[in-house]
C-alpha cells in the first residue's frame, strides 16, 4: 500500500510540471535554431517582422513579459508555448 501511494505521489509531481520555464526561439537561421530560456515573469514568446525593403523583412524573436508594440510597417506575433515563435 505504501509503495502504491509513493508511486502516485511521484507520478503526480511529474505530471504537474512544477516550475515550467518557457523556452522561446532567439535566432533562426539556415544553420539551426538558437533557444532562449525565459527569465521569471517573461511568459510570452514574440516574433516581429520589419520591412526593410519591398519583399525583404528583418525578424526579431525572444522572450517578453508583455507583447511588444507594433511600429510603422511592423507585424508582431506573441504566443505562450515553447518555441511557438519559430
From Swiss-Prot:
<keyword id="KW-0964">Secreted</keyword>
<dbReference type="Pfam" id="PF21947">
    <property type="entry name" value="Toxin_cobra-type"/>
</dbReference>
<feature type="disulfide bond">
    <location>
        <begin position="67"/>
        <end position="78"/>
    </location>
</feature>
<keyword id="KW-0800">Toxin</keyword>
<dbReference type="GO" id="GO:0090729">
    <property type="term" value="F:toxin activity"/>
</dbReference>
<feature type="signal peptide">
    <location>
        <begin position="1"/>
        <end position="21"/>
    </location>
</feature>
<dbReference type="InterPro" id="IPR018354">
    <property type="entry name" value="Snake_toxin_con_site"/>
</dbReference>
<feature type="disulfide bond">
    <location>
        <begin position="24"/>
        <end position="45"/>
    </location>
</feature>
<feature type="disulfide bond">
    <location>
        <begin position="79"/>
        <end position="84"/>
    </location>
</feature>
<dbReference type="InterPro" id="IPR045860">
    <property type="entry name" value="Snake_toxin-like_sf"/>
</dbReference>
<feature type="disulfide bond">
    <location>
        <begin position="38"/>
        <end position="63"/>
    </location>
</feature>
<comment type="function">
    <text>Binds to the muscarinic acetylcholine receptor (CHRM).</text>
</comment>
<keyword id="KW-0528">Neurotoxin</keyword>
<comment type="similarity">
    <text>Belongs to the three-finger toxin family. Short-chain subfamily. Aminergic toxin sub-subfamily.</text>
</comment>
<dbReference type="InterPro" id="IPR054131">
    <property type="entry name" value="Toxin_cobra-type"/>
</dbReference>
<keyword id="KW-1015">Disulfide bond</keyword>
<dbReference type="InterPro" id="IPR003571">
    <property type="entry name" value="Snake_3FTx"/>
</dbReference>
<protein>
    <recommendedName>
        <fullName>Short neurotoxin OH-35</fullName>
    </recommendedName>
</protein>
<keyword id="KW-1214">G-protein coupled acetylcholine receptor impairing toxin</keyword>
<dbReference type="GO" id="GO:0005576">
    <property type="term" value="C:extracellular region"/>
</dbReference>
<keyword id="KW-0732">Signal</keyword>
<keyword id="KW-1213">G-protein coupled receptor impairing toxin</keyword>
<comment type="subunit">
    <text>Monomer.</text>
</comment>
<keyword id="KW-0629">Postsynaptic neurotoxin</keyword>
Amino acid at each position: 500500500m505504501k509503495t502504491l501511494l509513493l508511486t502516485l505521489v511521484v507520478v503526480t509531481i511529474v505530471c504537474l510540471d512544477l516550475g515550467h520555464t518557457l523556452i522561446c526561439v532567439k535566432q533562426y537561421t539556415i544553420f539551426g535554431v538558437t533557444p532562449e530560456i525565459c527569465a521569471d515573469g517573461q511568459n510570452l514568446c514574440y516574433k516581429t517582422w520589419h520591412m526593410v525593403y519591398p519583399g525583404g523583412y528583418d525578424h526579431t524573436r525572444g522572450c517578453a513579459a508583455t507583447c511588444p508594440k507594433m511600429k510603422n510597417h511592423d507585424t508582431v506575433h506573441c504566443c505562450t508555448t515553447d518555441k511557438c515563435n519559430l
